[in-house]
UniProtKB/Swiss-Prot annotation:
UniProt lineage: Archaea, Methanobacteriati, Methanobacteriota, Stenosarchaea group, Methanomicrobia
Positions bound to ATP: 10, 12-15, 109
This protein's name: Putative adenylate kinase
Keyword line: ATP-binding, Kinase, Nucleotide-binding, Ribosome biogenesis, rRNA processing, Transferase
Subunit organization: Interacts with uS11. Not a structural component of 40S pre-ribosomes, but transiently interacts with them by binding to uS11.
HAMAP family: Adenylate_kinase_AK6
GO molecular function annotation: adenylate kinase activity; ATP binding; ATP hydrolysis activity
Length: 186
């Protein structure tokens, strides 16, 4: 089963996915790292200190990588971790964070003020959640505000375990659309 773990930068995707990789031995594809390592991008955006992913190249590379991972008998879950994961997977978990907290997290990382504000604004208008609805069949949402990576990883586990066991009715608390932060960023 391929599941996307997406969200605005700073919501906890990488921390959570690394915990799940250790605890559950689920295979994780850190898509942003793959894009950089294998040069699956069209250009370097100096202003934003990032690369512009070539989604055609990304989509053509992933099936081979996922097939290799799924060959391992114990491996039932592959998680695609990235703020771009919702463009690729049919099932996605969107990690969210209250924009003022998100700003603090990104400032700690040393992001420029412009990049911090751009990401906080994207979070306040539900940008990634809205895109996930457009691209994915199943969308779940987890609020990471004031929570540890371990607590959030527990929620991700609950969602994935429920999907694997066919018990989606247990997942109403992760239904998207309950968070409204439009007024949180000036």
């Amino acid at each position: 089963m391929l599941i996307g773990l997406t969200g605005t930068p700073g919501t906890g995707k990488t921390s959570v996915s690394k915990l799940l990789e250790k605890k559950r031995q689920w295979k994780i594809i850190h898509l942003n790292e793959l894009i950089k390592e294998e040069h699956l991008y069209t250009e370097v955006d100096e202003k934003r200190d990032s690369v512009v992913a070539d989604m055609e190249l990304v989509r053509s590379r992933l099936p081979e990588l996922i097939n290799e991972m799924e060959k391992e008998p114990a491996n039932k879950v592959v998680i695609l971790e990235s703020h771009l994961a919702h463009y690729i997977t049919d099932i996605v978990i969107v990690l969210r964070a209250y924009p003022p907290e998100l700003k603090k997290r990104l400032e700690k990382r040393g992001y420029s003020e412009e990049k911090v504000n751009e990401n906080a604004e994207a979070e306040s208008i539900d940008l990634i959640l809205a895109e996930a609805f457009e691209w994915c069949d199943k969308v779940f949402e987890i609020n990471t505000t004031g929570r540890t990576a371990e607590e959030t990883a527990g929620d991700v586990e609950k969602i994935i375990d429920s999907l694997l066991s066919g018990k989606e009715e247990q997942l109403q608390e992760y239904g998207p659309g309950s968070l409204d932060w439009i007024d949180s960023v000036p």
